[in-house]
Amino acid sequence: MFTNQDFEIFNDQTLAGRMHLIKTVIDPKFEQVAPTIITSLQTPGEPPFYAHVAKHLRRFKNPPVDTWVAFSQNKRSYKAWPHFELGLWPDRLFIYFDILDECKPAVQAKMQLADLTPLLKALPAGYVISNNHGVPATQLATPANITQAIKKFNQYKHSELVVGRAVLVGDPLFENADTLNKLIIATFKQLLSIYQPVMAAVSAERQA
């Protein structure tokens, strides 16, 4: 499972070097944990989830600033669908549910994101929220921050919704693989309550 040493891949400032470390150190861990996560997300009678390990194919000069595996009910892609992500920034491991820019129009066509407010506010302490998946910074998912994040999502064209948990480098959880794995699974299961109505809305829009 993930350890504090995994974050050392970001010390390599070259594209080739960091990509090699991602492929040989991090990606095998994503592939190892993916089946367990997929099983935890699966709902009887619903389409299966698929794991999408980031390939960083558009990187030609600068090394990736983060890396991840996404979980989507679309076999070919994930960015245009509500999805989950498990990944690493240089300072944290993240466990998130995402509505990215590519998915936003379909969500807004069929639902009011404010309808998710009660579900978001019911999240346990320690969850975080953001309007930009492309930066590591987040805010605690307090009622006030949730309200503000939903407002930004609705007001600004390229504003996204990211919510979940983050485990910072140096956290004792990285010394206990079993406990960390349980936290990852528990977080994704908790986020399912938010994912499901959003996915239903997007599916309805795509089938219209």
UniProtKB/Swiss-Prot annotation:
The organism's place on the tree of life at top rank: Bacteria
InterPro entries: UPF0637, UPF0637_domain_sf
Any Pfam family: DUF1054
Database matches in HAMAP family: UPF0637
Family: Belongs to the UPF0637 family.
Protein name as it appears in the record: UPF0637 protein lp_2332
